[in-house]
């Protein structure tokens, strides 16, 4: 490792590796990525089951090591059956691939992830769903959503109004949708409908994309842009618009990005915490790292920070930022939490239902907000091994749950257990042999599973710091004009960062107009 670089990037997640790979490959810059953990990937942590537990990036993990990897991405196990020691000892995870929290890429092989990987010559197949179904909790009926068909779980009036509003969303341009960036989707809904059925269904639909249960906390522009670009991309939830990854899981995205980065001369330091960004005369000029031999300074012309906003003040002293910005980050920004369930099954139970086995399944309002939750609790669930058979061993199947709660709710054990219990009861009502078909279950929570979000009315911190020269940000929580969420948002943020840091218009170079 040298003493000076063109660019130092803090964090080896998807955003940091994207910025590094493209600066190295296209701009021939000397770039160093520094990662405090012992592995690349950030929140893309993925596991492949073996005869004695799981492996992560080829390394077999003990239970404490598995829990440490989870902890590195703010995730922890809340329920396992049988318990983790028995799961490990019996080799129940052998042949399964899963993540530290449910992952999917929006638009699959046409998404931003695919665009960047293809740009770098590192294509990855991301097969996705084929179909979308809604399950009515009042009578447990399953409804395959058909293009142009009536929404039979809604009243005739609500179905008609819902379709009218969906047409309005999908006919917007990105510029028109951007007018709603600073209001909540709850406000947008209240301004467009007085029908509670319509409100609840569209709120649940939005939760698929935004992983937020309360529309009043959801930026309207982010969701409306998802809807606005569907026709240009030629994909939607009905035809298939989400991608999954086979072994070794979504961490393979990071592996491919890191490969492109290293092939272009980039360097990665693992297991090395950055303790401070060096700032002189309000200019970032390098970083201080902690090595086994003590602190060390590394100079850089530019610094890119991918640490989430709520953690930056550990390496960027507050004194360099306006007090309002510091207060907002500390007190008003919040974490979109994710409760994830992974279930190993003996048979393909979804074939019992009259829906496409590769459908995304939406269960709206399983628990009402009036029962003590910040928003209605909706369930997104699917058989991921039907999307990609390699996610489960031959003859077995992997069922996944994604449930949105806030960061504070994730730390309320009573609420988390209530949601898991209700989800389990729902499955038993719909599949009487649910327990007999199940070989194992694993539930995890993360209080930052879908990133850090600003309060309604505020934009995310932009990719170029306005107060410290030569300091840039990237990651799913950055970019005043990036939109979307999760991995695709991290990639968008990275491309926007490259627009400011590099010498080219990378947004136009890499992304189709509908992704900008």
Question: Predicted regions span which residues?
Answer:
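N-terminal glycine-rich phosphate/pyrophosphate-binding loop and immediately adjacent elements
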Residues: 3-161
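Hydrophobic anchor at the start of a short beta-strand
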Residues: 7, 28-31, 303, 341, ...
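General small-molecule cofactor/ligand-binding pocket signal
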Residues: 125-127, 267-269, 439-441, 472
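Rossmann-like flavin
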Residues: 134, 138-229
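Helical element adjacent to the flavin cofactor pocket in flavoenzyme catalytic cores
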Residues: 231-296
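Mid-domain catalytic core of redox enzymes
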Residues: 272-394, 514
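Conserved flavin/dinucleotide-binding core of flavoenzymes
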Residues: 374-516
